[in-house]
Design a protein with these regions (language model features):
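ABC ATPase NBD coupling module
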Residues: 28, 82-98, 199-201
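Helix-to-loop junction immediately C-terminal to a conserved catalytic motif
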Residues: 65
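Conserved ABC transporter NBD signature motif
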Residues: 73-81
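Short coil-to-helix segment of the ABC ATPase nucleotide-binding domain corresponding to the Q-loop/switch region
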Residues: 110-118
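Conserved signature/switch motifs of ABC ATPase nucleotide-binding domains
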Residues: 149, 170, 202
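Conserved ABC ATPase signature
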Residues: 150-154, 158
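Catalytic Walker B motif of ABC-type/P-loop ATPase nucleotide-binding domains
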Residues: 175-178
């Protein structure tokens, strides 16, 4: 099912949590990396974002997180035009979004436990209230025995699983994940997928950028497919 700059999928236009309308994006004076992107995601939906390297997946996620700015078109987040959001208000909105970056962005001076708990601490949570939940989550991603370790002593796969745990610990309104299973084995990949599905069942809107075709096929979730910076598919896996 294809989309264009003026058409939105019928099942996503009811109070979308995220909406792109004719969006283009470029870095500096370079050619556009995103071209005429239009779609809308309803609250509580689950989508994969697919496409070859360089198709624009990471750039699209950066727009949603307000790490980059569109060169044209309109991006709405929680019903608000991102370009109209005051800089002082952006940190609050970002706290409603859980993000798994490819580069992890862990704090080296904190333990795995404290890295995972950081969003709860920033939100004003008390350690006595969240200690058990954080420990349980770290156990779920296979880091129970490593919760007191510093990031420098973790493997690439362990760092990735820690970054995922940190992104979901606060049950965000939106979860954005950029290649979240790229450094883990199939067993952990399926466990991570189940974690995302459970979070989605609790109401979080999930958007996962991935090259993992097996993960997409196993999930049965709808796909946003990018080719050359254009949105070429909206629908179930394998339907164009």
């Amino acid at each position: 099912m294809s989309t264009d700059a003026d058409t939105f999928p019928a099942d996503t236009v009811d109070a979308p949590v995220l909406r792109f309308a004719g969006v283009g994006m470029r870095y500096g004076r370079s050619p556009e990396v995103l071209k005429d992107i239009s779609f809308a995601l309803r609250p509580g939906s689950f989508h994969f974002l697919t496409g070859a390297s360089g198709a624009g997946k990471s750039s699209l996620l950066k727009l949603i997180y307000m790490a980059e700015q569109a060169s044209r078109g309109r991006v709405e987040l929680f019903g608000r035009d991102i370009n109209a959001i005051a800089p002082a208000d952006r940190p609050f909105l970002r706290r409603r979004i859980g993000v798994v970056f490819q580069e992890f962005r862990l704090l080296e001076h904190l333990s795995a436990f404290d890295n995972c708990a950081l969003p709860l601490r920033i939100a004003g949570g008390k350690p006595d209230h969240y200690r058990g939940d954080v420990a349980e989550l770290l156990g779920w991603v296979g880091l129970k025995a490593r919760m007191h370790a510093r990031p420098a002593t973790l493997s690439g796969g362990e760092k990735q699983r820690l970054a995922i745990a940190r992104a979901v610990v606060g049950r965000p309104d939106i979860l954005l994940a950029d290649e979240p299973t790229g450094n883990v084995d199939q067993g952990h990949a399926l466990r991570i997928l189940r974690l995302f599905v459970e979070l989605n069942r609790l109401g979080t809107t999930v958007l996962i950028a991935t090259h993992d075709e097996d993960l997409v096929a196993r999930s049965g979730q709808p796909v946003l497919h990018l080719e050359g910076g254009r949105l070429m598919q909206y629908g179930r896996s394998g339907s164009r």
